[in-house]
Regions:
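Gly/Ser/Thr/Pro-enriched helix-cap/hinge segments flanking short amphipathic alpha-helices
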Residues: 1, 266, 325-338, 344-484
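Beta-propeller blade termini
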Residues: 35-45, 80-89, 128-137, 177-187, ...
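Surface-exposed loop and edge beta-strand positions of immunoglobulin-like domains
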Residues: 41, 85, 98, 133, ...
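Short glycine/acidic-enriched loop and turn motifs that connect beta-strands
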Residues: 102, 150, 200, 249-251, ...
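Solenoidal tandem-repeat scaffolds enriched in leucines and small polar residues
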Residues: 125-154, 164-166, 172-203, 224-233, ...
Length: 484
């Protein structure tokens, strides 16, 4: 698909990332080794984004960030992972923390504090990389954890309790020590996994419904030492979610194109990006549209010896990625990435965590030369209740002139680059339950809260077989925007 954007050289010439850590008042690190845990979200509902980094909860106040860990009721420790997610569907973000060999689930009390509900819910939560998602499409967020002994899947029972369904789901042997990401890779309106693990290739697990997943036979990544990190995004704007694989041990990054939802093929065109990680260990990777041109770029962080490494590659929209890492400041060894519009100025800033439990803000100055649209979804708590509050797992399709792009909703905040378009022609939300909802002609450079509209059940198609009417299919309007 084509795109109409301001000349890239003009945008990039005026764009820089500035280390604004001291300016916004982020305190120094905890000093604990290897606590580069990072989560970024508005947990207190006051409209600005807060941080959980290195085991500390930092509340965003007018004068800077304040350490409220003890006041908020969070335990101290040596965390290895953390993630915000609204497991009880009340519109306030709860928190999972992996520390000291176990996982703890904290419920947001809506007053700035959290309560540890792990025991009261009867949870036996492993420590590992967490993922909140609604894999069974019943309207609440389940919890997946990639732990030291393999993958775990805990189903939310709609009443606040969880059931371990790992064995039935078939992901227990997915591998240990890596990470998980989700998306609807085959475009059949359910949530699939991609699992990265130590000692094996990354692998896609297709959702077969009824709580079961099946591993695709082909692996992603060519290294037996393991893939470590994977990231999901439609980087070629064809409507299907692709996968970036970042192996451990200073080996090349790999990109896999989703070929119409059926198979993944290695994309060897972006040579600069593919060779980029050979000289450092990648600890995290993310897709990010840093210049608002509607094409997903790639961000990598890690270390080489005692030196930090951060690399940024701009998607040139023609199968190539240009190395624009000179737009970034020097950094210490880094562990994790979180992106979002911290400055609320229309472009995506970058938070990174360091090995000693500190966070740094790399402020995007100039990415808003192109236009944008920010969205937040709100699922209905009435009616069928089949969509979680923030719409995690929904698919967004956006068309603006010749620019078409797809985004999978993985958190409350959705950022869409529009290039130089003054508006989008249409934004289609396909909610996690498969029901579509269209927003026509939203103007650029604004934030939109899109609430789910209660609709009747979808129409069904029956055919007469000579003796009786037989069911053919439901009509869920699954074609991409602008396509038959």
């Amino acid at each position: 698909f084509g795109t109409e954007v301001r000349d890239a050289e003009t945008v990039l010439a005026a764009l820089r990332f500035t280390d604004a850590t001291d300016i916004v008042g982020i305190p120094a690190g905890s000093g604990a080794a290897n606590t580069g845990v990072l989560a970024f979200a508005d947990y207190d509902g006051d409209g600005d984004r807060d941080l959980f980094v290195g085991g500390r909860l930092l509340q965003n106040e007018i004068t800077g960030f304040v350490d409220v860990t003890q006041v908020a009721g969070l335990a101290s420790g040596q965390p290895s992972a953390a993630l915000f997610g609204d497991y009880d569907n009340d519109g306030f973000l709860d928190l999972y923390v992996a520390a000291d060999g176990e996982g703890r689930l904290y419920r947001n009390a809506r007053d700035g504090s959290f309560s540890d509900v792990t025991s009261s819910l009867g949870l036996s939560v492993p420590a590992g990389a967490p993922l909140f998602l609604d894999f069974d499409q019943d309207g609440d967020l389940d919890l997946s954890v990639s732990g030291a002994s393999g993958g775990f899947l805990l189903r939310n029972n709609l009443d606040g309790s969880f059931t371990d369904v790992t064995s039935r789901a078939g992901i227990g042997n997915a591998g240990a020590g890596g990470s998980m990401a989700f998306g609807d890779f085959d475009d059949d309106d359910d949530i699939d996994f991609v699992v990265s693990a130590d000692g094996r290739q990354a692998r896609v697990y297709d959702n077969e419904r009824l709580g079961r997943f099946a591993a695709r036979p082909e692996g992603l990544g060519s290294y037996a030492a393991g893939t470590g990190i994977s990231s999901v995004g439609d980087y070629n704007n064809d409507g299907f979610l692709d996968v970036l694989v970042a192996p451990r041990g200073g080996r090349a990054v790999e990109l896999y194109l989703n070929e119409s939802g059926t198979t993944f093929g290695a994309d060897d065109r972006p040579t600069a990006l593919l060779a980029s990680a050979r000289d450092f260990d990648v600890h995290d990777a993310a897709f990010i549209d840093f210049d608002n041109d509607g094409w997903l770029d790639v961000l990598l962080v890690g270390e080489s010896g005692d030196e930090g490494v951060i690399r940024l590659f701009r998607n040139a929209a023609a199968g190539q990625f240009d190395d624009v890492s000179d737009l970034l400041p020097d950094v210490p060894p880094l562990r994790r990435i979180a992106t979002g519009d911290f400055g609320d100025d229309g472009d995506l800033d970058i938070f990174v965590s360091t090995a000693d439990g500190a966070a740094r803000l790399l402020r995007n100055d100039g990415g808003n030369a192109n236009r944008y649209l920010k969205m937040q979804l709100v699922g209905l708590s009435t009616g069928s209740g089949k969509n979680n509050h923030f719409g995690l797992g929904a698919k967004l399709e956006v068309r603006a002139g010749g620019l078409y792009q797809t985004r999978v909703v993985t958190g409350p905040d959705i950022h869409i680059g529009l290039g130089q378009h003054a508006r989008a022609d249409v934004v289609r939300v396909r909610w996690p339950n498969g029901v579509p909802q269209n927003l026509f002609y939203p103007g650029a450079n604004q934030s939109v809260v899109e609430e789910q509209i209660l609709k009747g059940s979808c129409p069904f198609l029956y055919t007469w077989d000579g003796e009786a009417f037989t069911f053919v299919t439901d009509l869920m309007w699954k074609s991409a925007l602008g396509m038959p």
